[in-house]
Swiss-Prot record:
Role played: Catalyzes the S-adenosylmethionine monomethyl esterification of trans-aconitate.
Keywords: Cytoplasm, Methyltransferase, S-adenosyl-L-methionine, Transferase
Name of the molecule in the record: Trans-aconitate 2-methyltransferase
EC number of the protein: 2.1.1.144
Subcellular localization: Cytoplasm
Reactions catalysed, as given in the entry: trans-aconitate + S-adenosyl-L-methionine = (E)-3-(methoxycarbonyl)pent-2-enedioate + S-adenosyl-L-homocysteine
Superkingdom, natural source: Bacteria
Location (main, coarse): cytoplasm
GO annotation terms (biological process): methylation
Upper taxonomic lineage: Bacteria, Pseudomonadati, Pseudomonadota, Alphaproteobacteria, Hyphomicrobiales
Family according to the record: Belongs to the methyltransferase superfamily. Tam family.
UniProt-listed InterPro entries: Methyltransf_25, SAM-dependent_MTases_sf, Trans-aconitate_MeTrfase, Trans_acon_MeTrfase_C
Gene that this polypeptide is encoded by: tam
Length: 257
């Protein structure tokens, strides 16, 4: 995929940061020495970590140059590293690995979570939040439009960009086997947006990227118009024109024994 767009992502900065704050609130650590923000994006979650743990050595890691440029401008005193999470290995065992809205882009969660858990210092925590919305209308309709002419051939692989999440039982079993105690929960946020275009703008910064990147500008516009029309049928507006977007997310905090 093309590089991420920090400005597009931050159009909904408050809504995207709230789950990170909710995840951090459940991390049972008082004074970790080493904290790594995996998939730190533009630094919104990193700022929360720095505020919660002011004495920790906090590192932000991301594969997007655009996201990292924004993060470095926001938090010049923090160390940010450009790296692919799939092959990342820390120099020293971290006390906290914090992964807000990033692991859904990576495959093999059984192997991935076991590998991350093994990186932790004894007593350390892996804290993860992932969107769990692939069966919401916002995402089902992406796939439906992608399967229609004239997009189908070019977007045949787009739906595979996101990993389908496991069940609570799966994540508990995988992390328990890796020597962790596990705290799991699921929350559905309900976001009021300014019409159906608001949903388009939201997912354009994340979930729509695999569907738009293979298309030229004219076909992108055609795809978005058809997608927005489908959203209008799936999300009836409120009396004042607002549209409510339910957004389920899966959370886990695993602590190494």
């Amino acid at each position: 995929m093309a590089d991420w767009n920090a400005a597009q992502y931050l159009k909904f900065a408050d809504e995207r940061t709230r789950p990170a704050a909710d995840l951090l609130a459940r991390v049972p650590l008082e004074s970790p020495a080493r904290v790594i923000d995996l998939g730190c994006g533009p630094g919104n979650s990193t700022a929360l970590l720095c505020a919660r743990f002011p004495r920790a050595a906090v590192t932000g890691l991301d594969s997007s140059p655009d996201m990292l440029a924004t993060a470095r401008e926001r938090l010049p005193a923090v160390r940010f590293v450009e790296a692919d999470l799939a092959g990342f290995t820390p120099a020293e065992p971290p006390d906290l690995l914090f992964a807000n809205a990033v692991l859904q882009w990576l495959p093999d969660h059984a192997g991935l979570l076991a590998r991350l858990a093994r990186m932790l210092a004894p007593g350390g925590c892996l804290a993860v939040q992932m969107p769990d919305n692939l069966e919401e209308p916002s995402h089902r309709l992406m796939r439906r439009v992608a399967g229609e002419a004239p997009f189908a051939e070019r977007l045949a692989q787009a739906a595979a960009a996101r990993t389908r999440l496991g069940s609570f039982r799966d994540y508990d079993a995988w992390l328990s086997a890796a020597g962790c105690t596990v705290d799991l929960w699921r929350t559905t946020y309900v976001h009021p947006l300014a019409g159906h275009r608001g949903i388009v703008e939201w997912v354009r910064g994340t979930g729509l990227r695999p569907f738009l990147d293979p298309l030229d500008p004219a076909d992108q516009a055609a795809f978005l118009a058809r997608y927005e029309a489908a959203l209008a049928e799936a999300y009836p507006p409120q009396a004042d024109g607002r549209v409510l977007l339910p957004f389920p997310r899966l959370f886990l905090v695993a602590r190494r024994r």
